[in-house]
Amino acid sequence: MGHQQLYWSHPRKFGQGSRSCRVCSNRHGLIRKYGLNMCRQCFRQYAKDIGFIKLD
């Protein structure tokens, strides 16, 4: 079995490796609440466009 056959061959159906940001495909700092599926950096960038407002 060569490297090409083994690389990323394990099924990723659940867990952190199965989910990624819909904008930048990052896997860290993911916000899944309300079905956002965005990393926190992209959420900060697009929050106003989505309709989130910052409360004091």
Curated annotation (Swiss-Prot):
Give the GO cellular component terms, alphabetically.
Answer: cytoplasm; cytoplasmic side of rough endoplasmic reticulum membrane; cytosol; cytosolic small ribosomal subunit; extracellular exosome; focal adhesion; nucleoplasm; ribosome
| Alphabetical UniProt keywords | Acetylation, Cytoplasm, Diamond-Blackfan anemia, Disease variant, Endoplasmic reticulum, Metal-binding, Methylation, Phosphoprotein, Ribonucleoprotein, Ribosomal protein, Zinc
Name the needed cofactors: Zn(2+)
Residues with PTM Omega-N-methylarginine: 12
Its family?
A: Belongs to the universal ribosomal protein uS14 family.
Per UniProt, subunit arrangement is: Component of the 40S small ribosomal subunit.
The GO molecular function terms of this record are: structural constituent of ribosome; zinc ion binding
Q: Which residues carry this modification: N6-acetyllysine?
A: 48
Q: Which domain of life is it from?
A: Eukaryota
Q: Which Gene3D superfamilies match?
A: 30s Ribosomal Protein S14, Chain N (4.10.830.10)
State how the cofactor is bound: Binds 1 zinc ion per subunit.
Q: Which disease is it linked to?
A: Diamond-Blackfan anemia 13: A form of Diamond-Blackfan anemia, a congenital non-regenerative hypoplastic anemia that usually presents early in infancy. Diamond-Blackfan anemia is characterized by a moderate to severe macrocytic anemia, erythroblastopenia, and an increased risk of malignancy. 30 to 40% of Diamond-Blackfan anemia patients present with short stature and congenital anomalies, the most frequent being craniofacial (Pierre-Robin syndrome and cleft palate), thumb and urogenital anomalies.
| Taxonomic lineage | Eukaryota, Metazoa, Chordata, Craniata, Vertebrata
GO biological process, any: translation
Q: What does this protein do?
A: Component of the small ribosomal subunit. The ribosome is a large ribonucleoprotein complex responsible for the synthesis of proteins in the cell.
Q: What is its main location?
A: cytoplasm
Subcellular localization:
Cytoplasm, Cytosol; Cytoplasm; Rough endoplasmic reticulum
Report whether Transcription regulation shows up as a keyword of the record.
no
Q: Where does the record place the modification Phosphoserine?
A: 9
Swapping residue 31 to F leads to an effect described as: In DBA13; results in reduced protein expression; results in pre-rRNA processing defect
Q: What is this protein called?
A: Small ribosomal subunit protein uS14
Q: Which organism is it from?
A: Homo sapiens
